[in-house]
Amino acid sequence: MSKKKILLLLGGPSKERKVSLSTGRAVYLALRKLGYEVIKFDPKIGSKFFLQYNCDLAFNALHGQFGEDGTIQSLLERQKIPYTHSGVKSSAIAMDKLKSKKKFIKAKIKTPEFKVIKKISDLNNIISKKKFVLKPINEGSSVGVVICKNLSSLNKVEVKMYLKKYGKLLQEEFIEGKEVQAAVMGSKALGAIEIKPSRNFYDYNAKYSRNAKTKHIMPANLEKKIYNKVLQIAFRAHKCLSCRGVTRSDFRVTRDNEIYILETNTQPGMTPLSLVPEIADYSGIAFVKLIKWMVLDASTNR
C-alpha cells in the first residue's frame, strides 16, 4: 500500500504567518520521517491554486485569519479534500472570542466578565474600575492584546487606533492567577502545562522567542483535584465548540482554585517552543506520533 500524498498548508496571509511557517517546518520534517510524500503550499486569501495538486489530504499548519477561521476549511470541504483539525463552523466560532465566550457561558464553563467595545465611551463600565484586558475579537497569538491597570492608565490614542484597525474590541476582566494551558487530542485531554513568562504577560514574544526566558512547568503545579478539573473543562470546551483533532485551551487558575477559561485554540502551534507537543510528549506521545495521529484523523465533514 502506497503512502499518502499530503498537501501541507503553511504561511498564509495572517499576522501569525511567521508562527505558521515555523509550525510548517516542524510538521514537514515529521511527515517526511513518516515516509509521506509532502507538497508544501503557502496560500493567499481566496487562492485555490492548491487544487492543482492531486493530494490525498491537507495538513493545515496555518494560524490566524484565513487558516483558522473557517475560510480554508470551507474551501477544502467544497473540494472534498480531507483535512486536519476542526471544521468550518467550530473554527469560525473558536476564532471569534465573543461567540466562543457565549458558547462557554451556555455550557456553564466559567469565563472572565467581558464587554464588547465599539467606541471609547463604551469603556465607562464596571470592568474598567479594576485591571482589565483589551483584545481583538478575531486574532490569535496575543496579537493586539493590551493589559490595563484601570481606565485612567489606558492610552486612549492607542485604543482609537485599535478600534479603527479591528472595528471592535473585547474588554475582559483580568484574572490574577496561574496561567495554565491544556491540550485535547480527539476524545482525550492529554495534560496541562503552567506558563511563567519573565514579564507580566505571555505575549507574542514570550510565546515564540527563544530569548524570552518563559518557564514551562509540566505538569502544571496544581492540586491533583484542580489539575484534573482543568482537564475536564478543556475537554468540555473542545466538545461544546464541536472541535475535532487537537486543540489547546487557555486558563487562569486563581489562588482560591477558581478556574476561568480564556479561549480554545483550534490550530495550536507545533513549533519547537509550542505547548501541545510538549504536553503530548510528557503524556508519552512523541511529536512524530502526534503528527501521524493527526494525519489518520483527517477527514471532510468536520
Can you say where each PLM-predicted feature lies in the sequence?
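Active-site "cap" helix and flanking loop/linker of ATP-utilizing ligase/carboxylase catalytic domains
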Residues: 194-247, 278-302
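ATP-binding N-terminal substructure of ATP-dependent carboxylate-amine bond-forming enzymes
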Residues: 1-89, 93-95, 99, 118-124, ...
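Active-site nucleotide/adenylate-binding loops and adjacent lid/helix of ATP-dependent enzymes
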Residues: 1-10, 38, 50, 93-178
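Conserved metal-phosphate-binding beta-hairpin within the catalytic cores
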Residues: 173, 184, 238-270, 280
